[in-house]
Amino acid sequence: MKDFAQRYALHNEVHARPPEIMSPPLAITHFVMLADAAQQDSSRAHLAELLRDHHLPPPEAQASHLRMDFGAFRLRWELHTEFVTYTILQPLDEAWVSRQELPQAMAAVPQAWLAKLPGECLCSMHLWVLTAGQGQRRELVREHLREDMLVGSTVLDGQAEFFTDMALHPDGFSRALVFAESGLKNLSARRLGRLVQRLLEIETYRMVALLGLPTARAAATLLTRGEAELASLAQAIRTAQSEQEPELLDRLSRLAGEVESHYASTHSRFSASNAYFDLVNRRITDIAEARLEGLQTIRDFMDRRLTPAMNTCDWARRRQQALSERISRMSNLLRTRVEIEHQQSSQALLAAMNKRQDLQLKLQRTVEGLSVAAITYYLVGLIAYLAKGASALGWPLSPETSSALAVPLVAVSVWWSLRKLHQKITQSHT
């Protein structure tokens, strides 16, 4: 039995990117790097360099994700369509409680290696998974997060609590705290890992979804100009004379090309933003959050902040599509109008040609009549000369009588001959 070439790859796809097994206390640093195809290859090579420095095997040539334990820290590397994520996990000892600042997981990674991550940083986040009592939890939240922008909720049906301020701090990182303590409920290490992965994905997909917002704002200028141009063309078409229509059709075609070109360049971005927005909503549903008194939930924050941005992207996409359809309809109407006028011009031209042909036929018949008279005249003249000569030889009729008798015979013969010749020529051209 021959296996399908990609059987194992397809089978193992459902097991790709499994969540980490996590136990508090834990420090996590998460990076999202925008990367094109070349930078994604560089990312794989950059990862191989770190593994080589720690005497670990390199990733496979086509690897799209990797989890590796370096001892002092664990690294999770994932390759996506538009970006690459690096998640650094550092277990903490219980002595972290007495420290002024929470440890950052990125400190355990060679800083020179971090500084050279391929691509452009879209998102960077510090997240801590801790156990703490109510009083200490409030102190940690107050010390590390901005209370005026605080977002918090219980998650996994009350088995943990999550806090963040969705803000960039002076170091360029956003921050989040997850409390999984015995005072709430016992939370398995595997389920805690799934929770943290979903929280990181919410932040990642939120930022990637927002990539469509600058594009939507930039599209507004083009769309406003295009709509104004289309309105001007519509007014001009209403009052245009036939000789102006080709110019209007050319302007309309240029506008259609400009709008379609811009639509093609932005459609994939808007579609991607919509897909990432759906992922954000699904991940929020997955964490099963519930409200903490006095705080907005993640769902509340996204509804107030992210949803309007995504509506702007969707509005730009629908506006582009509507403008394209209106241009197409107007182009079809104008082309139909031009074609009808061309048909009318062609019919008028054919009528004029038929009229000229009838006139030519009448002239031809007139010329034929004159030709019969002229040929008859000359032939009768020749007969008169023959009759004069014949009279000397005893021809009984006078030359005048002979000429008079010859006129009808010659005229009929000439007319009949020209008629046959005309019919022959006509048949040869049909």
Language model features with spans:
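N-terminal pre-transmembrane cytosolic regions of membrane proteins
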Residues: 1-123
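Conserved aromatic-histidine-acidic binding/catalytic patches
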Residues: 19, 211-214, 218, 261, ...
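Extended alpha-helical interaction modules
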Residues: 89-251, 257
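Short, positively charged
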Residues: 168-185, 216-223, 227, 262-287, ...
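Cytosol-facing regions at membranes
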Residues: 232, 279, 308, 315, ...
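Membrane-associated alpha-helical segments
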Residues: 255-380
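Alpha-helical transmembrane anchor segments
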Residues: 358-430
